[in-house]
Amino acid sequence: VNVFFLISGYFTINFKLNKFLMLLGEVIFYSFFIYIIFAIEGGEILNVKNIMKYSILAVNEYWFMTVYLVLMLVAPYLNIVIDLLKADKRKYSIFIITLFAITCIYGFAFDKDVINVNGGYSLIYAIFLYFTGNFIKTYDIINDCKKMHILYMLAGGVNFLLALFLVYLGKGNMAWKLFSYNNPIVYIQAIALFISFLTIKCNGRIGIFIGRFGQYTLGIYLIHSHSLLIPYRFRELEIIMKDMGVIFWPFLILLYCIILY
């Protein structure tokens, strides 16, 4: 999710009504199609309330799509701010650092309902990532940062060890919080992963492969994140994880994500 918002900022969003409506239509299609299947199978009641919920109001089923569609609407104004800032790297840097302090320091450590960063599941955090992505492109950060894949693995390792330590102390909720989108370590990981992919030359078959599979990513997200499917999505994984040690959880989750995709 973090990387997707970074990509949006890197290339910037040029709002077009037809693209907005096409994206909204895709959300409605997947949501309503899944609902109809459940209704036919008897797992959901077919009535006006549910038809409205899974069609016209379908966007509420997906926090990410809600945030992204709103981000598309406000993007023209964000781009104006970018035009004002990018002429002065110092001011833009201070702006990014300020947003980082608000969303990833205060928002991660203390925020409840004050600024509603909500663990990164929010518009304000998406906007911060949008600016970050643009900052990377504006000042060509790619050429200044080498071997970012190493930073990505180091940050991931540190976060994982911290989580294990908290689980050992019986602080399971705190351990889970470490995987919030606005955890400073996760934020750094996202940037490192994003820049790593930017430095890869995707020519020939690799480029074709990524292009073909990339176009299905949104559809896959809309399917496995649907509220009617979520109870079934993790059921088998939870059963397996109960019988496995905590140290194997990341590998199980990675394998499960690959299978799910």
Predicted regions and their residues:
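Membrane-interface helix-boundary motifs at transmembrane edges
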Residues: 13-22, 78-91, 136-150, 199-211
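Alpha-helical transmembrane segments and terminal signal-anchor/GPI-anchor hydrophobic tails
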Residues: 124, 142-219, 225-253
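Loop-centered beta-sheet repeat module
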Residues: 95-141
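Transmembrane alpha-helical segments
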Residues: 5-16, 70-74, 78-81, 128-137, ...
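Alpha-helical transmembrane spans of integral membrane proteins, capturing the lipid-embedded, hydrophobic core
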Residues: 19, 23-35, 68-69, 96-101, ...
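Hydrophobic membrane-embedded alpha-helices
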Residues: 22-53, 75-115, 146-176
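Interfacial loop-to-helix transition and helix-capping segments at the boundaries
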Residues: 1, 52-67, 109-129, 164-192, ...
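Transmembrane alpha-helical segments and their boundary/interface "anchor" motifs
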Residues: 1-5, 12-71, 151, 155, ...
